[in-house]
């Protein structure tokens, strides 16, 4: 198989790589992504390590648009293969909100506690607690050729936060098949079932040739 099979150009510079820029300044997200990928031969760089990186305004109306914009902009700037994600919480009773506005649902600056409180208030008295986390992963080569995959984790919302782990809306979200929130389950379990884990697993499978013919040891 050649790099063409993973949807990228077949020129040598567009084939496999050993260094990957993860386009996030969020330390929780960087740690989670690098732990989930867990490819021994692959080294990761965070956005905070990239001097002079431009700020990418996430003004798209879909997760895919935002992920692609981040990946392409920073790949072209850095000259590195770049992986970006955009993700958020979609609540059925709120017609998909907070959606792409998940990080800043309660306004700027982004604040997890304020966002959770706003969701709790919006859901007061509503019996349908169905929700999902959705994640779109974008991988761009240095020239800006980009591909995307997506993953989701279905679940339900609690009426109050529970648990001290995780970040974002994790203390409110109970994934299907579990009685604990994302903030209560182990990191190992979350990195197996989360929306981001599912999207990253699809990324590895779809672009295995790009990821230097290496696959992470995914949990059974």
Model-assigned labels for residue ranges:
Residues 12-15:
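Short hydrophobic targeting helices and cationic amphipathic motifs
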Residues 19-21, 27-220:
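Anionic-ligand binding patches
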């Amino acid at each position: 198989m050649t790099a063409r099979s993973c949807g990228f150009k077949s020129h040598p510079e567009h084939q496999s790589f050993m260094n990957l820029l993860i386009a996030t300044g969020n330390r929780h997200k960087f740690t989670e992504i690098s732990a989930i990928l867990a490819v021994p031969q692959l080294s990761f760089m965070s956005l905070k390590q990239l001097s002079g990186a431009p700020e990418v305004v996430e003004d798209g109306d879909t997760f895919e648009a935002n992920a692609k914009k981040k990946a392409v902009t920073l790949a072209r700037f850095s000259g590195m293969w770049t992986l970006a994600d955009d993700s958020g919480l979609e609540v059925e009773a709120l017609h998909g909100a907070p959606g792409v506005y998940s990080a800043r649902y309660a306004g700027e600056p982004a604040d997890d506690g304020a966002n959770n409180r706003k969701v709790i208030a919006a859901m007061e008295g509503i019996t349908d607690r169905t929700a999902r986390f959705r994640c779109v992963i974008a991988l761009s080569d240095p020239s800006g050729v980009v591909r995307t995959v997506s993953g989701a984790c279905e679940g339900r919302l609690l009426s109050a936060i529970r648990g001290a782990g995780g970040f974002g809306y994790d203390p409110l979200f109970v994934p299907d098949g579990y009685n604990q929130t994302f903030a209560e389950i182990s990191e190992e379990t979350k990195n197996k079932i989360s929306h981001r884990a599912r999207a990253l697993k699809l990324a590895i499978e779809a672009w295995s040739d790009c990821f230097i013919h290496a696959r992470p040891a995914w949990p059974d």
